[in-house]
Structures are given as structure tokens and as C-alpha cells.
Amino acid sequence: MIIAITEIMDLIPHRYPFLLVDRVLKIDPNKSIIGIKNVTVNEPQFTGHFPARPVMPGVLMVESMAQLAAILVAKSLDSTKNKEVFLMSIENTKFRRIVQPGDTMHIHSVIDQQRANVWKFSSKVMVECEIAAESKFTAMIKDKM
């Protein structure tokens, strides 16, 4: 099932310039998800990171993995309209390849464990069949206040 940007914006609260998932290519609710982020030189982070050689900041690769995991949560639950996803921990993060404008980040997220409102994920960013970044996340799902 492909999920376009308009539905992604219905599922998570992030907006430009902090919306870091452009499309979902495949989703298996309660199991896994694959999405993409097209990296372009017009994005604001590249004005300072780094002007002579733009490089996607690692923290934004981590954020893209977390956003994709939140989309997986939203599609796995019956409804998330009254729920929020809060990141609790980030572990074992590794950066293995530079990502730059012109690259397409293929983001993968797998649910490792779900107990009540606590979910654990393994995620990675791939560029041209190489791992660019990988991380493990724990998130909590709470009712909106």
C-alpha cells in the first residue's frame, strides 16, 4: 500500500521544514514499513550544513526514522486521532554513509516489540543499497491532552 504525502500529513503532526518522509512505499501494519525521503539542495539545513559540501545532518536521518515509525503506529492502531507518539529513547545509532542532495533515503522500520503503550523499533536509512544510518527507538503512545 502506497501512502502519499497528503495522508502522511493526516497521520503525523510534522510539517515543512520538519516533515522528513515524502512517501510510504510499503506497509505491513503491526510489523514493518518502508518509506522514502528525497533529499534536495533547497532544504533549509543545507544553508549551514555545509555550504561548500551539503551533507544531511545525522540527527535529521534519525528524525526521519522516528517519523516513519510513528506512521507505522498510526496505521497499526484503529485510530490515532486522539493519540500522540512520544519518543522515549534512541539507542545504538550508527552513521555509515554520507547523505547529500540528490540522494533518495529509503527508510525501513520494523516493530521489535509492543507492550501496552510502549513500542520498540529497529530502523535504518538506505541510500543506493548501502546503510547510511541505523538506530533502535522506544516510543510511548499516549492520549492527547
UniProtKB/Swiss-Prot annotation:
The active site is at H49. The lineage of its organism: Bacteria, Pseudomonadati, Pseudomonadota, Alphaproteobacteria, Rickettsiales. InterPro entries: FabA_FabZ, FabZ, HotDog_dom_sf. GO terms for cellular component: cytoplasm; membrane. Involved in unsaturated fatty acids biosynthesis. Catalyzes the dehydration of short chain beta-hydroxyacyl-ACPs and long chain saturated and unsaturated beta-hydroxyacyl-ACPs. Its main location: cytoplasm. This is 3-hydroxyacyl-[acyl-carrier-protein] dehydratase FabZ. It comes from the Bacteria. SUPFAM superfamilies: Thioesterase/thiol ester dehydrase-isomerase. HAMAP family: FabZ (MF_00406). It catalyses: a (3R)-hydroxyacyl-[ACP] = a (2E)-enoyl-[ACP] + H2O. The keyword Lipid metabolism applies. Pfam families: FabA.
